């Protein structure tokens, strides 16, 4: 099983390097890191400040303009550059809590045949305020579950909730369903 990670980026920085480093230590290896960068000049300016060899060897960078960027279309373009079985889309500021993130996501994806997507919990920052902590704990409970149409009466709109901060998709099902809606203006 091949796993690619697609990362939409605007204004790369040290947090992106930290993400690259953490993804390089996952127990499930990343085949390719596919960065969908907004504004080539920002990437070039940042890359010039790095030590030679600092960027991962499995990194591919594709550029879009600010006008072309869209939360759905940019992820679609990144997934189109992939030939992996699993595509993990994550934001550049989402840092794995441990080395088992990709294993947990892929285990969830392949635990049942008809599962198409699995998303990660967002943990509250240690120094966050009480409202942010409650929001994270409410939206991302510590128990995993499979959601189905039959859960609609119980979960309501939460039945369809999926975080775009860090989610893994079976590429074959994703493509069969047509990918993300274009002109996605929320994150």
Show the residue positions of the predicted features:
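Conserved nucleotide-sugar donor-binding
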Residues: 83-84, 163-177
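Glycine-rich, basic loop-to-helix element that forms the pyrophosphate-binding segment
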Residues: 65-82
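Short aromatic/hydrophobic "clamp" motif used to bind/position activated sugar donors
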Residues: 87
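Cell-envelope/extracellular polymer assembly enzymes that use nucleotide-activated donors
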Residues: 2-4
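Conserved donor NDP-sugar-binding/catalytic core segment of glycosyltransferases
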Residues: 100-132
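Acidic donor-binding segment of Leloir-type glycosyltransferases
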Residues: 23-63
